[in-house]
């Protein structure tokens, strides 16, 4: 039987979603697979909609796995949460999946949110869940810059990590919204798929624009140059959240 689950996790202590050979530390995938084994004594592979990097959080990661069991869905969910209780991972929902469902390849849209605290004083309580940017940001300029990245089939070669293995750097970004709420700024980014570290490079570029390092229209030149060195810094991972996956 194939199961589909929505998962929340704090990425702080993890090396990322995916198991990585030769890398010290624990992955989210490993934690969930270990919990399933403790429940069923079955070795399964858990697949995710988004292979989040080390330090990146999830409010609505979607996963699937195949399991041979007669247990009811709620029993599986509660048991996994019991085994995951010390790992900062929580199964929010779990149900039988339709035949052929794949958490990654069936996804139609992924929604990310990046959280910035924009004030002089550094945060204490959530310092590993947001990016502290002390210098005042112009959110209007950030939004104008973001508008140049929204639309069908743009080449984001300047906005992907050097280690990105995707064959094509062309992506359609459906939404980038920059919203200020008091001292907090939220950057919402939605697309069917993203390049490696694309969202974080977008956010880093928008922050530099918000500081006045370059005008919003300069984003057009960054896209045209198709060179990672042309774009801004890569925002740190701990402000990024995978919020929702649509199917």
Swiss-Prot record:
Belongs to the tRNA pseudouridine synthase TruA family. It is an enzyme of class 5 (isomerase). Homodimer. It holds the Pfam family PseudoU_synth_1. The active site is at 53 (nucleophile). It catalyses: uridine(38/39/40) in tRNA = pseudouridine(38/39/40) in tRNA. HAMAP family: TruA. GO terms for molecular function: RNA binding; tRNA pseudouridine(38-40) synthase activity. This is tRNA pseudouridine synthase A. Signal peptide: none annotated. Substrate binds at residue 112. InterPro entries: PsdUridine_synth_cat_dom_sf (IPR020103), PsdUridine_synth_TruA (IPR001406), PsdUridine_synth_TruA_a/b_dom (IPR020097), PsdUridine_synth_TruA_C (IPR020095), TruA/RsuA/RluB/E/F_N (IPR020094). Transmembrane segments: none annotated. One of its GO terms (biological process) is tRNA pseudouridine synthesis. The keyword Isomerase applies. Formation of pseudouridine at positions 38, 39 and 40 in the anticodon stem and loop of transfer RNAs.
């Amino acid at each position: 039987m194939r199961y589909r689950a929505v998962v929340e996790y704090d990425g702080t202590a993890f090396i990322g979603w995916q198991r990585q050979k030769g890398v010290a530390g624990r992955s989210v995938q490993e934690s969930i697979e270990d919990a399933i084994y403790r429940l069923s004594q079955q070795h399964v592979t858990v697949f995710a909609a988004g292979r989040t990097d080390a330090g990146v959080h999830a409010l609505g990661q979607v996963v699937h796995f195949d399991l041979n069991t007669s247990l009811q869905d709620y029993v599986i969910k509660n048991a996994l949460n019991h085994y995951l209780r010390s790992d900062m991972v929580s199964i929010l929902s779990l149900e039988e999946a339709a035949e052929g469902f794949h958490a990654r390849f069936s996804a139609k849209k992924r929604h990310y949110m990046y959280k910035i605290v924009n004030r002089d004083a550094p945060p204490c309580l959530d310092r590993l869940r947001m990016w502290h940017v002390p210098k005042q940001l112009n959110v209007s300029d950030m939004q104008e810059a973001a508008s140049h990245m929204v639309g069908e089939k743009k080449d984001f070669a300047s906005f992907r990590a050097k280690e990105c293995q995707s064959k094509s750097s062309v992506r359609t970004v459906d939404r980038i919204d920059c919203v200020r709420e008091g001292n907090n700024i939220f950057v919402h980014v939605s697309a069917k798929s993203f390049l490696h570290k694309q969202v974080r490079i977008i956010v880093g570029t928008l922050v530099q624009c918000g500081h006045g390092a370059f005008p919003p229209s300069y984003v057009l030149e960054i896209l045209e140059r198709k060179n990672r060195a042309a774009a801004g810094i890569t925002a740190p991972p701990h402000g990024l959240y995978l919020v929702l996956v649509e199917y």
